[in-house]
């Protein structure tokens, strides 16, 4: 589903940031949001995401298999979005203390809904947001 898109991260009752790309996919935006959050904060971090793509990679150790097998997936195909996965995996490994938890999207989770709203706004307006 290439097209314009937005990403966002939100700290409950705290800061937030959002951005956009003119041509992207939802998976790339989920990765970008996670990478930006991991790069922004020091210390222990809990990433709560509605992206099984991101959460399962770390929870189930996909990334370790990718590194061992030369960046091919279980289907023996090149891992998609490697240009974002590599810096994200490197950042998570370098800092440690990053945990991942999945939350169902559009299910009434206040902060997931807020991140989604900000991502849609950034993508629609083609602008960066922060606060």
Feature locations, PLM:
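A short, polar/acidic, helix/strand-boundary loop motif
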Residues: 13-30
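RNase H catalytic domain
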Residues: 1-4, 16, 20, 34-114, ...
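Acidic, His- and aromatic-enriched active-site or binding-groove loops in soluble protein domains
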Residues: 120-131
């Amino acid at each position: 589903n290439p097209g314009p898109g937005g990403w966002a991260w939100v700290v409950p009752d705290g800061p937030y940031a959002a951005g956009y790309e003119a041509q992207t996919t939802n998976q790339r935006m989920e990765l970008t949001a996670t990478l930006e959050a991991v790069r922004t904060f020091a210390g222990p971090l809990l990433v709560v995401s509605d992206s099984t793509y991101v959460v399962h990679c770390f929870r189930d150790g996909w990334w370790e298999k990718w590194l061992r097998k030369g960046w091919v997936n279980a289907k023996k195909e090149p891992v998609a979005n490697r240009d974002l996965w590599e810096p994200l995996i490197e950042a998570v490994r370098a800092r440690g203390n990053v945990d991942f938890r999945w939350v169902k999207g559009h299910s009434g989770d206040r902060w997931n809904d807020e991140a989604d709203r900000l991502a849609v706004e950034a993508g629609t307006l083609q602008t960066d947001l922060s606060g």
